[in-house]
Amino acid sequence: MKTSLPIVVLLTAVISGVHPNPTPKSCTVSEEDLTTIRNAIQKASRASLDDVNLDEDLIAKCPLLKTITASLKSVASEIATLKDTGISEEQVDELKQSYEQQVNEIVKSRDIFEKQSGGDVMKEQGAMINRMTELQVQVAQLQQQIGEQTSRMYDDMAELIFQRLAMNSTDSIRNYTAHMMEQKLHTLMTKLETNYRIFLGALRYLDHLGDQPLIDKVFDGILKRLDEMSLETNKERENGKYVLVNLLCWTVNNRFLTEKYRKKQLELFRIALKFYPKTGNKEANEADIRGRQFCDANFPVNVITWFAVSRAAEGWGLRGTL
């Protein structure tokens, strides 16, 4: 017995972890409109923002198409951004080819795009909602997959950059790095914060240099920056959380920072309370922290959610310092 399309959509969403948007009340695109939609999606496989376009009238007929278009634009933007990083053109081209192939597989889906015989209008509308929902799920799965691939590429790039620096660390490189950290610390940290994987990689590279005074200076500089950050804008608040969490990642089992951490513990706790003030929301805080950290350790979560939030707020009288 053939499994009905709504059941397939539901099972696909549950198994993959991709959740379709709430079912819209209507989706009145016609069978002829499907050809236009298919052609637009096929054109989007080029992974160029200029090629991701869908007629506003079609989106008005079926709101799910807005989500689908947004997902395709997100992927195109993600791939375009790779060109401005240190990732090789070959890797970017390979990713684009993979994306194009998978989009072309989606547009070949008979369940979604094959013309169906006419029938009751309400049944046809319900069937079209199911077809567009499946399309949304498939595009969302592809978006998630591309996101995971680009994330791995960034990880590999950051690791390679600092591995090469460590392997080829001459006196001139060490001296130049120390000079930049001494003279341009704020500017350098601000630039590194555009990619937190690279931010953490740069901090770990300092351990390779083994310059204790420089490591102390950078640690203090980051604390000062966190202290000065405003919580009034979402961008600044989000950036501060990423910086705090990955600063703690750098601290994990770091022989250069054992003493520094002891001395700055109360300051760290106060800053943790600044960015995570909802002390009773431990589970949500923990999930948020794990989503930001680029290390496998539990240390950032333990510090922020337990010591800095629970004990500091209740027993160490830090509330009044904020």
From Swiss-Prot:
Disruption phenotype: RNAi-mediated knockdown results in prolonged intradermal probing prior blood engorgement when mosquitoes are fed on human host. No significant effects on probing and feeding time when mosquitoes are fed on membrane-covered heparinized blood. One of its GO terms (cellular component) is extracellular region. Salivary protein that promotes mosquito blood feeding on the vertebrate host by inducing morphological changes in the mosquito labrum. Interacts with the mosquito labrum end tip and triggers salivation and probing. Modulates enzymatic activities of human tryptase and chymase. Glycans are attached at N168, N175. Monomer in solution. Interacts (via the N-terminal domain) with cuticular protein Cp19 (via the C-terminus). Its main location: secreted. Residues 1-20 form the signal peptide. Female salivary gland (at protein level). Female saliva (at protein level). The keyword Signal applies. It comes from the Eukaryota. Proteolytically cleaved by human mast cell tryptase and chymase. Keywords: Allergen, Disulfide bond, Glycoprotein, Secreted, Signal. It is found in: Secreted. It comes from Aedes albopictus. This is Labrum-interacting protein from saliva LIPS-2. Disulfide bonds join C27-C62, C249-C295. Antibodies against the protein are found in the serum of individuals exposed to Aedes albopictus bites.
